[in-house]
Amino acid sequence: VDALKKFSIHVSIDDYNEAFWRLFSSDLVPAIHPTGSVPTFESDSREKGGVISFSAESVVSLYEHLKKQSMMLHYNQASQLMMNAYTFIENLEKKNFGITCFDISDFIVINGQYYVFVNDSKIVELDNKDDVLVIDEPIQKGEFMSPELKNLTRIPSRIPKTTTLFSLGSFVGTMLTGERLKAEGDIHSDFIYSIYYTKLYWCIKQCVERNPKDRGYIYI
């Protein structure tokens, strides 16, 4: 077993408070248990955010993780990424927040097997009553954005919260197959055909439906 090292994650979103960061920290617990330390949160009033600190065997960026294996994930790794990211989506929704989109630079990999989302600049307000993300300022663009987010023409705007699922599905699918989701045509067979009949195939397929109302997350 590798010796434990200390790591920290700096955060600085105005809307967050200590209670929210305790929820965020809980996402780290499965990644560092049982060898790591319980994450701690220290607020910083000057930055209107804080620092989450913890110990683990290793922490690398997802990009560094991918470089070791031809910039792709194996099936079990992609499944873990999908489940880890969706758990974080669910945790955010409980606090009325959502994520605009995903990309390689948004994740760290803890102990070589757990994927944690750390890009707080992509977190926006979620209206749980209407199931929409509230976009009230310019957002960070990304390759794996949903069509409705790519075509956003005015701010403020409200877009279906399933825009996050579209991004998650297209992102994980590309990490696994190396294929890009096409703008037109039979995106499912071209995009993730190589994993047809697997649990992850059907999960991704539903995430990337063109109609936001048809999207969902089912991984069974």
Give the role of each language-model region.
Residues 167-179:
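Short, conserved alpha-helix in the C-lobe of eukaryotic-like protein kinase catalytic domains
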Residues 32-76:
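Conserved structural core of kinase catalytic domains
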Residues 208-219:
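A conserved short helix/loop substructure at the end of the activation segment
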Residues 195-210:
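Conserved C-terminal C-lobe helix
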Residues 86-98:
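Protein kinase catalytic-loop region centered on the HRD/HxD motif
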